[in-house]
Amino acid sequence: LNVPWYGASITCTVHCGWVHGRLCFFIEPHSQDAFFHRGCYYGCDDDPMRFAFFSKAALEFLLRSNKRPDVIHCHDWQTGLIPVMLFEIYKYGGMEYQRVLYSIHNFKHQGFGGTEILQATGLNRPEYYFQYDRLRDNFNPFSINFMKGGINYANHVNTVSPNHAWE
């Protein structure tokens, strides 16, 4: 799988296997950035870029493999750009009927980034995405907010607990 990234591409290997009776696909990028070969899942300075890449790779996999799920279920800020890219890029490539459920696990961590993330993913119009009703963070107008993008672009949003729903 070749994933478009910054005007070039990053090659990934897609592994598949059964987990609890369900066929699952795992995407392994082969990049000099070693996005996910670090010994930790979170807490790296480039987490927004790493998870933006993962989101792009997941959509590229669905597109290239002709898999068209009815619902794409995204979890927390790490996948907040999936609904954005789905409705701004991938619907024009044949993925126009998928619906997105976005689940919020923790409002404390929302995922922030700048124009470099938009450029890397192919969301090439910063002036369009840095709008209040799209990705612009409410407190830092020079930053995009992944969670806000997930909320604004998803068809449905839910939380993992009643307390989060109240917040």
Model-derived features: where do they sit?
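Catalytic cores of nucleotide-sugar-dependent glycosyltransferases that transfer UDP/GDP/TDP-activated
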Residues: 1-167
